[in-house]
Amino acid sequence: MTSTKEIKNKIVSVTNTKKITKAMEMVAVSKMRKTEERMRSGRPYSDIIRKVIDHVTQGNLEYKHSYLEERKTNRIGMIIISTDRGLCGGLNTNLFKQVLFKIQNFAKVNIPCDLILFGLKSLSVFKLCGSNILAKATNLGENPKLEELINSVGIILQEYQYKRIDKIFIAYNKFHNKMSQYPTITQLLPFSKKNDQDASNNNWDYLYEPESKLILDTLFNRYIESQVYQSILENIASEHAARMIAMKTATDNSGNRIKELQLVYNKVRQANITQELNEIVSGASAVSID
């Protein structure tokens, strides 16, 4: 039978673990509020520029931009956004499962995939898988700077413009609320025309000054940058929300484990006391008989 000393040591150990997970939960709550506010403030810009792109693609363009060109898919590129740290439940695992499933589906029809990786977790997984990694960026922090992302994104855009890559996807965790975050994979290039009822019903078109090429090049590049940056903000907010839930679950489980150990401790202590009483009674009986 386990001694009371061993059980006490276990209770102390679990109690210390509970203090750590509770502290991590509180830190995650604080960081999540800040990152959620930052993420939500960026959504209007990302949505509006997406709407402008939808309107542009519905118009009659004199200049046919390469980002609008549909071509035969011989090779794809994927931007994968993960966390740098763990302890956030199945956030990264669920995303990687979907990414690997998509990559494997393309591989079945002999379409290879090049990767741009953001986050240490994606780097460790896809490096182990032997994937072709074009660029990587890690340790972006809570408030990443756009300048830190442009170089990595520019590499895959250059591959697309040189027609070495025919489609680009972006994979990240989309923040829905504090309790749910969804792994998401969307096509970044070429631009897919959405069925925008407002845009299709309008007979107007844009006038470009000084020239459509200059305007569209700038607009499309801003769009790509905004989508990647917003996806990273979504993933950071999702990370802290998932970590908050994971640490709360760990704290609750620690509390339950402490109660179980306390019950075992009381039972062992009671058994020891009963045994000692029996020994005393037996000893007293032996003395009285003598």
From Swiss-Prot:
Subunit note: F-type ATPases have 2 components, CF(1) - the catalytic core - and CF(0) - the membrane proton channel. CF(1) has five subunits: alpha(3), beta(3), gamma(1), delta(1), epsilon(1). CF(0) has three main subunits: a, b and c.
Similarity field: Belongs to the ATPase gamma chain family.
Protein name: ATP synthase gamma chain
GO biological process: proton motive force-driven plasma membrane ATP synthesis
Membrane topology reported for the UniProt record: Peripheral membrane protein
GO CC aspect terms: plasma membrane; proton-transporting ATP synthase complex
PANTHER family registered for this protein in UniProt: ATP SYNTHASE GAMMA CHAIN, ATP SYNTHASE SUBUNIT GAMMA, MITOCHONDRIAL
Record keywords: ATP synthesis, Cell membrane, CF(1), Hydrogen ion transport, Ion transport, Membrane, Transport
Domain of life: Bacteria
Function comment: Produces ATP from ADP in the presence of a proton gradient across the membrane. The gamma chain is believed to be important in regulating ATPase activity and the flow of protons through the CF(0) complex.
One Pfam family linked to the record: ATP-synt
Localization, UniProt: Cell membrane
Disulfide bonds: none
Listed GO MF terms: ATP binding; proton-transporting ATP synthase activity, rotational mechanism
HAMAP family reported for this sequence: ATP_synth_gamma_bact
